[in-house]
């Protein structure tokens, strides 16, 4: 019966107010967050939430949607939240055998927003976490 089922466990995680851009860059997020109460609908390992701005990750991640992020190491094909030269981006990660890092837009009509980092490029790249999605095909 309905009353025999345990209540869904609720918890709070930070929802960052500064969006991660899926397309054009957004400013880096810091202390500007609100606590979001989540339940069993949210993946268990989610450590934070980020609102997405832009269309470069559609149709998998829509403009203005909220994604859930953990701190698991990224593997090629994973989607992550990145700080690139001081701006926040949501992109699909790929690293080749030479150490070149590619950040892809899943919406290939927005390939203009792809980023490439070669060794010695002098560009700053930090990963803030892995977006919790099912495996997606690389857009190559």
Regions found by a protein language model. Give the residues of each.
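Short, well-ordered loop/turn sites that connect or cap secondary structure elements
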Residues: 61, 74-75
